[in-house]
C-alpha cells in the first residue's frame, strides 16, 4: 500500500546578494553639555585684584627700600652744594627756598653723622633729609629752632631719636659756624616740652614704624652764645606742621596714574601687534619711571614724619 504524499509549503526564495540592508534607526541627538560658569568677569576681577596687590607691594618696597636710595642721592647732592657754600661763606643764615640745604647735623649717640638739613618740613622736603621748620630760627640763633625728621621711610634719619639720653651732644653747622647742644628733656604729642631756656633745639619725629599718630620730641640747650638771627621768619602752612600730609600731591598723583595707565595700555596693544618681548622691553623703562612718580606722590600724602 502506498503512503499518500504530503503537501510541503513552498520554500522561500533565496535572498539576492544585491539586496539593500534595512537602514538602522537614527540615534537621538546628544543632549547639550551643561553651561559652565562664565569665566570672563571672574578672570577680570582676579586680574584686577592681583594688579592692585602688586601695586601695594611695590609701594611698600618703595617706602622701605627704594626711598632710602632716593634720600641718599639727595643727601649727596645737597652735601656737595652746602660744602661749597660754607667754603665761600654763602650758606643761608635766614629764610631761603624750600628744599635748599642750610645746615649739617651730627648726633654721635645715634650714629647720625654729616646729615644735611634742608629748609621746610612738608612731606616733599623731608624726602631729602631732616627739615627745618621755616617759622623758627636757624640752629645757633637766639630762640627755639625746630627740626623734623622721618622715622621710617626715606632714610629714616630720626628713627633712633628715642634712644637719646640726657647729656648727649648734638652738633649743628650752619653758615654762622658750628653750634653744640646738650640734650636735656623729652616730650611727645601729649606732653610738649616745657623747657624755658631761651636758646634751644627741638627734634621731632613720628612715634611709630607704621603710620604715626603722635610724635617723639627731644629738647636740647645751646652751649655757648648764639649768633644774631637773620631776617624775619615766614609763616607756616598746613603742610608744614607735624604729621601733615601734602595734599597738593593729589593732583600730580592722579596725572601720573593716568599716564601710567595709558603707558600700560599702549604696551599691551603693541604686544598684540608686534613682537611681545620687544614691546615689553621698550615699554619697561617708561612704565618704571611713571610708577616711581606715582609712588613718590603717593608717599607725599602720608604723614610728613613717617
Regions found by a protein language model. Name each.
Residues 11, 52-55, 285-288:
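Short linear sequence motifs
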Residues 2, 7, 35-253, 296-306:
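Solvent-exposed, non-transmembrane regions of membrane-associated and secreted proteins
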Residues 1-33:
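Acidic/Ser-Thr/Pro-Gly-rich, low-complexity N-terminal segments
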Residues 256:
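Short acidic-aromatic active-site loops that bind/stabilize oxyanions
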Amino acid at each position: 500500500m502506498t503512503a499518500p504524499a504530503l503537501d510541503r509549503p513552498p520554500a522561500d526564495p533565496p535572498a539576492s546578494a544585491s539586496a539593500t540592508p534595512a537602514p538602522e534607526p537614527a540615534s537621538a541627538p546628544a543632549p547639550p553639555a551643561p553651561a559652565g560658569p562664565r569665566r570672563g568677569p571672574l578672570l577680570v576681577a582676579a586680574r584686577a585684584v592681583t594688579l592692585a596687590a602688586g601695586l601695594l607691594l611695590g609701594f611698600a618696597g618703595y617706602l622701605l627700600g627704594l626711598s632710602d636710595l632716593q634720600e641718599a642721592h639727595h643727601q649727596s647732592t645737597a652735601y656737595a652744594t652746602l660744602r661749597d657754600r660754607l667754603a665761600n661763606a654763602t650758606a643761608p643764615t635766614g629764610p631761603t627756598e624750600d628744599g635748599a640745604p642750610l645746615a649739617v647735623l651730627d648726633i654721635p649717640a645715634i650714629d647720625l653723622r654729616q646729615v644735611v638739613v634742608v629748609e621746610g618740613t612738608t612731606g616733599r622736603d623731608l624726602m631729602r633729609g631732616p627739615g627745618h621748620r621755616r617759622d623758627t630760627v636757624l640752629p645757633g640763633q637766639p630762640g627755639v629752632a625746630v627740626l623734623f625728621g622721618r622715622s621710617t621711610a626715606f632714610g629714616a634719619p630720626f628713627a633712633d631719636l628715642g634712644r637719646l639720653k640726657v647729656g648727649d651732644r648734638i652738633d649743628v653747622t650752619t653758615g654762622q659756624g658750628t653750634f653744640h647742644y646738650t640734650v636735656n628733656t623729652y616730650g611727645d604729642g601729649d606732653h610738649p616740652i616745657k623747657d624755658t631756656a631761651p636758646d634751644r633745639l627741638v627734634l621731632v619725629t613720628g612715634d611709630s614704624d607704621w603710620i604715626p599718630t603722635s610724635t617723639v620730641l627731644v629738647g636740647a640747650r645751646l652751649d655757648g652764645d648764639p649768633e644774631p638771627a637773620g631776617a624775619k621768619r615766614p609763616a607756616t602752612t598746613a603742610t608744614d606742621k607735624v604729621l601733615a600730609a601734602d595734599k597738593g600731591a593729589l593732583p600730580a598723583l592722579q596725572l601720573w596714574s593716568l599716564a601710567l595707565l595709558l603707558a600700560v595700555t599702549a604696551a599691551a596693544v603693541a604686544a598684540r601687534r608686534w613682537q611681545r618681548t620687544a614691546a615689553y622691553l621698550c615699554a619697561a623703562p617708561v612704565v618704571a619711571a611713571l610708577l616711581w612718580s606715582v609712588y613718590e606722590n603717593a608717599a607725599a600724602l602720608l604723614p610728613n614724619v613717617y
